[in-house]
C-alpha cells in the first residue's frame, strides 16, 4: 500500500494520479474534507481507502499497523502563506510531520514530504542549505524548521527520507485553493467572466520559477523509484514573469489584454519578487526530468481547465 497525505489536495491528488498511471490503486488517501469541494479531485482517480487526517495521526501515534507500506508521500499541510495562527500552523505542519516521519523511520518506510521555496524568504540564491534560508511568514518557518529537523536525522536514517522545496506550482486540481490558487487559474477565470486578465503593478519585474504540477508529481515518483534521500529544490531552474503566464492564458483563449492593478499593501515586505530553483543538487542525484516552460505548462493546463 502507498499512503498519500493531502491526497485530495492539489499536489497530493496529482501524485495519486501518477501512481494510478503506474497501475497502483492500493492507495490510502489522508486528508481533511471539511472543505467538501476537494472531493472532486478524487472522482476520476482510483484509491483503496480514505482516512481523516486527525484519525490518521491518532493511529500513527498509537503505532497502529497499516500492513505493508511501500511509501508515504506527505503532502498534507496548511499551505496558506497568509495564515498567521502560528500555534495552528506549527501543530498542523511541524508536529504532525515529525510524528509521521518517526513512524516511517521506525519501520523503514520511504518517506517523501513537501517542503517549500517559502523557506528561502527574500533571499536571491536558492540553494538547499541553511545559510540561504530565511522565511518571511509562519508557513515558511514551519517548513524550514522541519527541513532542519530532517537534516539532523538524515545521517542515521536507514530508509529514504526526501523533501522537496516546491517553487510556484500550478496546474490541474488546484481549484479548491481559492486565493492561494495559481495566477494562471485566476487569469483564466477572469477571461471566462469577460474581463481582461489583471496583474499587479510591477509584475513585469516579478520573476518566479513556475513549475507544472505534473512535473512535480513526476519528481516525487522518480525519488521513490530510485530510493532517494535528501532535501531538493523542485522547480524548473528558470525564472519567468507573471506577464509570460498572462500571455500564455491569453493565447489559449485568443482574446484579452493585460490590465494593471495596484499592488496590495498587505503583501508588501512579505512578497517574493524573484524565485529560481538551483537544480544542481537534484541533477547530481540523477534526476534528468525536462521541466515544462510556462508556455508549455500553461497551454496544457488551459486545455485541461477548459475541457468540455
Swiss-Prot record:
The record's note on its domains: Contains a large N-terminal NADP-binding domain, and a smaller C-terminal substrate-binding domain.
Protein name: ADP-L-glycero-D-manno-heptose-6-epimerase
InterPro entries recorded: Epimerase_deHydtase (IPR001509), Heptose_epim (IPR011912), NAD(P)-bd_dom_sf (IPR036291)
PANTHER family named among the record's database cross-references: ADP-L-GLYCERO-D-MANNO-HEPTOSE-6-EPIMERASE (PTHR43103:SF3), NUCLEOSIDE-DIPHOSPHATE-SUGAR EPIMERASE (PTHR43103)
Domain of life: Bacteria
Active site: 139, 177
Cofactor note: Binds 1 NADP(+) per subunit.
Pathway linked to the protein: Nucleotide-sugar biosynthesis; ADP-L-glycero-beta-D-manno-heptose biosynthesis; ADP-L-glycero-beta-D-manno-heptose from D-glycero-beta-D-manno-heptose 7-phosphate: step 4/4
UniProt KW Isomerase keyword: yes
Family of this protein: Belongs to the NAD(P)-dependent epimerase/dehydratase family. HldD subfamily.
Recorded catalytic activity of this chain's protein: ADP-D-glycero-beta-D-manno-heptose = ADP-L-glycero-beta-D-manno-heptose
Cofactors (names): NADP(+)
Alphabetical GO biological process terms: ADP-L-glycero-beta-D-manno-heptose biosynthetic process; carbohydrate metabolic process
Intrachain S-S bonds: none
HAMAP family: Heptose_epimerase
Binding site for substrate: 168, 179, 186, 200-203, 208, 271
Binding, NADP(+): 10-11, 31-32, 38, 53, 75-79, 92, 143, 169, 177
Keywords of this entry: Carbohydrate metabolism, Isomerase, NADP
UniProt-recorded Gene Ontology molecular function terms: ADP-glyceromanno-heptose 6-epimerase activity; NADP binding
Function: Catalyzes the interconversion between ADP-D-glycero-beta-D-manno-heptose and ADP-L-glycero-beta-D-manno-heptose via an epimerization at carbon 6 of the heptose.
Gene name of this polypeptide: hldD
EC number of the protein: 5.1.3.20
Amino acid at each position: 500500500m502507498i499512503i498519500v497525505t493531502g491526497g485530495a489536495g492539489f499536489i497530493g491528488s496529482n501524485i495519486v494520479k501518477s501512481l494510478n498511471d503506474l497501475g497502483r490503486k492500493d492507495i490510502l488517501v489522508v486528508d481533511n474534507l471539511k472543505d467538501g469541494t476537494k472531493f472532486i479531485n478524487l472522482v476520476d482517480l482510483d484509491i483503496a481507502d480514505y482516512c481523516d487526517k486527525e484519525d490518521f495521526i491518532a493511529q500513527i501515534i498509537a503505532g497502529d499497523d497499516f500492513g505493508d507500506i511501500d511509501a508515504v508521500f506527505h503532502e498534507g499541510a496548511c499551505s496558506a502563506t497568509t495564515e498567521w495562527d502560528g500555534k495552528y500552523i506549527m501543530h498542523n505542519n511541524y508536529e504532525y510531520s515529525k510524528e509521521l516521519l518517526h513512524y516511517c523511520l521506525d519501520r523503514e518506510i520511504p518517506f517523501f514530504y513537501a517542503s517549500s521555496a517559502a523557506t528561502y524568504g527574500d533571499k536571491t540564491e536558492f540553494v538547499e542549505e541553511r545559510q540561504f534560508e530565511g522565511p518571511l511568514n509562519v508557513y515558511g518557518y514551519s517548513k524550514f524548521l522541519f527541513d532542519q529537523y530532517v537534516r539532523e536525522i538524515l545521517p542515521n536514517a536507514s530508509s529514504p527520507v526526501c523533501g522537496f522545496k516546491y517553487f510556484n506550482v500550478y496546474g490541474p486540481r488546484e481549484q479548491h485553493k481559492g486565493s492561494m490558487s495559481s495566477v494562471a487559474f485566476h487569469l483564466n477565470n477572469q477571461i471566462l467572466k469577460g474581463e481582461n486578465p489583471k496583474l499587479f503593478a510591477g509584475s513585469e519585474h516579478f520573476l518566479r520559477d513556475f513549475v507544472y504540477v505534473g512535473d512535480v508529481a513526476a519528481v516525487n515518483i522518480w525519488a521513490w523509484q530510485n530510493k532517494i534521500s535528501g532535501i531538493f529544490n523542485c522547480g524548473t531552474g528558470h525564472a519567468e514573469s507573471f506577464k509570460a503566464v498572462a500571455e500564455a492564458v491569453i493565447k489559449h483563449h485568443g482574446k484579452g489584454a493585460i490590465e494593471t492593478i495596484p499592488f496590495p499593501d498587505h503583501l508588501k515586505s512579505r512578497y517574493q519578487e524573484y524565485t529560481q530553483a538551483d537544480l544542481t543538487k537534484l541533477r547530481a542525484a540523477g534526476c534528468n526530468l525536462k521541466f515544462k516552460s510556462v508556455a508549455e505548462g500553461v497551454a496544457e493546463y488551459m486545455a485541461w481547465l477548459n475541457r468540455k
